[in-house]
């Protein structure tokens, strides 16, 4: 039986050359978790919180999710969940759907209410000035381990924020790692990989 490594391995200090910045970019990708080809997913050989290949089953595709404004996906966060024998993490991904018509309710809202999802979001802090693996912190994956499920969905006709659209909060619990990143050789190569997720897999 393997012994899990629970030690820290690096100095705790901010990077002066590549300081972290808050926030997310305005566009991400959401996938039905059942469409992910887990058998084709590959992790980095030494960094097990880095996925190098995220594949979908043949004929399946992900969908763009765009949230505009100064703070897109506001409220998206990761928090510690203490357990009896092991601590885990809870991921929350928030988004808004600025529409409310029969097609949106049928094709988006009803699905979000009952499905399991994987979401890829792009951090504004990309780590592009790192000496090794520049850009490896740009794309973060949520929902891979347990699936993101609806925690809150609401439609307020007089909301100043959604203007009659939908507020969505998805949550993933019992996550074994603090973060999971998507990175394949470079930032540009990874961005291309993310873009291919919205096209039917071959």
Functional labels for PLM-detected ranges:
Residues 5, 44, 129, 194-196:
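A detector of low-complexity, intrinsically disordered, Ser/Thr/Gly/Pro/Ala-rich segments
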Residues 11, 33, 70, 98-102, ...:
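Generic structural motif
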Residues 28, 95, 119-121, 170:
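Generic structural hydrophobic/aromatic packing signal, biased to beta-strands
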Residues 141-202:
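Mixed-charge, glycine-accented linear interaction segment located at domain edges/termini
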């Amino acid at each position: 039986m393997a012994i899990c490594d629970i030690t820290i391995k690096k100095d705790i200090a901010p990077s002066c050359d590549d300081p972290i910045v808050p926030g997310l970019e305005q566009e991400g990708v959401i996938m039905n978790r059942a469409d992910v080809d887990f058998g084709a997913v590959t992790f980095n050989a030494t960094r097990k919180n880095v996925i190098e290949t995220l594949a979908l089953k043949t004929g399946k595709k992900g969908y763009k999710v765009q949230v505009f404004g100064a703070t897109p996906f506001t409220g998206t966060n990761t928090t510690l969940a203490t357990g009896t024998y092991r601590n885990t993490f809870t991921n929350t991904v928030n988004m808004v759907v600025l529409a409310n018509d029969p097609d949106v309710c049928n094709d988006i809202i009803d699905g979000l209410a009952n499905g399991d999802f994987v979401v890829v979001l792009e951090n504004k802090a990309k780590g592009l000035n790192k000496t090794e693996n520049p850009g490896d912190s740009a794309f973060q994956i949520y929902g891979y381990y347990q699936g993101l499920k609806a925690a809150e969905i609401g439609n307020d006709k007089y909301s100043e924020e959604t203007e009659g659209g939908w507020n969505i909060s998805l949550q993933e619990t019992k996550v074994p790692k603090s973060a999971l990143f998507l990175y394949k050789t470079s930032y540009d190569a990874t961005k291309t990989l993310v873009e291919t997720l919205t096209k039917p897999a071959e």
